[in-house]
C-alpha cells in the first residue's frame, strides 16, 4: 500500500500559513494542523509564549503525535509551521516512516519584511507583542530557513510568493499541487 502524503507549509510569522493550509485541505483532502495554534491553545498562560520562545522538541513532538494519531492512515496530513527546526525535521522524517507516511511537498510562503509588518499590525493576536514578534522572526531566520533549504535540497520544496493576495497565493498552491 502506498504511503499517505504529508504536506508542510512554512514561512515567517504572518505569512498566511494557517489560511493556506486550510485552503490546501480542499485540494488534497486530509486534515491540516496549525501546530502554533495548538500550542497557543494548550499553553496560553505559559510565559514562554509571550516571549516568542520555541518550546523544547519533546513538548512539540508530543503535541504533534497526540494530534495526528486519530488521522486515518490513508488520509493526507497538512502541517502548518512544523517542522520549525532541524531536529523536528529529522523527527518528522523518522516518525513519517514509522507511520507509513512521506513528505510529498513543502510549500515555503516567502513574504517580504514590509508585508509581514503590515499584516501583523492588522492581526492583533494576543501573543503578537513587539518582543515576541522579533524573537519569532529571529527563530525563523536562524532555525527555520535551514530546514527550508534542506527540503529544497531533497527536491520537495515549492517556493510560493506569499506577498500576493490570499486568493492569488491559494491559486499558486493549487497549481503547484496539480503539477
Where are these regions (language model features)?
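Glycine-rich phosphate-binding loop of ATP-dependent small-molecule kinases
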Residues: 1-179
